[in-house]
A protein has these predicted regions:
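Conserved loop-alpha-helix segment in the C-terminal half of the alpha/beta-hydrolase fold
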Residues: 70-110
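Post-His helix in hydrolase/transferase enzymes
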Residues: 110-124
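Terminal domain-start segments
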Residues: 1-5
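Conserved alpha/beta-hydrolase catalytic His-Asp/Glu region
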Residues: 8-65
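Secondary-structure boundary motif
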Residues: 57, 66, 91-92, 125
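Alpha-helix C-terminal capping segments
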Residues: 10, 24-27, 88-93, 124
């Protein structure tokens, strides 16, 4: 696909710049930014391209009804403004807990570590 070709064919410097530019949407933890960017740089770009395509084109709203185990979904704080839409997306997931962080972005485990650990412990115990 064009997206995969773009990821694979992009010069390393351009790819790194793209990752650096977009990271502001994923974490507020400035000290973690180099690590997260390095993960991207170390990843297989064809796999990243496939992942982007799959995430953009795959609707699992029907399939999730077959998940039988209790499921914890941790969401970044910005999604709390769209609770109705989020709950619609997970409506068929039978044993779910949707929890919204009070702060942070995609890497909520870095942005609000204490909240993240608390949610995991409460869910598991």
């Amino acid at each position: 696909t064009p997206i995969i070709k773009e990821f694979v064919g992009m010069p390393k410097e351009n790819f790194q710049q793209a990752q650096t530019s977009s990271i502001v949407y994923y974490t507020e933890s400035k000290d973690r930014i180099p690590q997260i960017i390095q993960w991207s740089m170390d990843s297989d770009r064809e796999t990243i391209g496939k992942m982007v395509c799959e995430l953009s084109n795959t609707d699992l709203r029907e399939e999730i009804q077959h998940i039988e185990v209790p499921t914890l979904v941790l969401l970044e704080s910005v999604f709390s403004f769209s609770k109705d839409k989020i709950e619609q997306q997970y409506a068929k997931l039978p044993k779910k807990e949707l929890r919204y962080a009070n702060k942070g972005l995609h890497f909520v485990m870095y942005d609000d570590f204490d909240w993240y650990i608390k949610q995991l412990k409460e869910f598991i115990l």
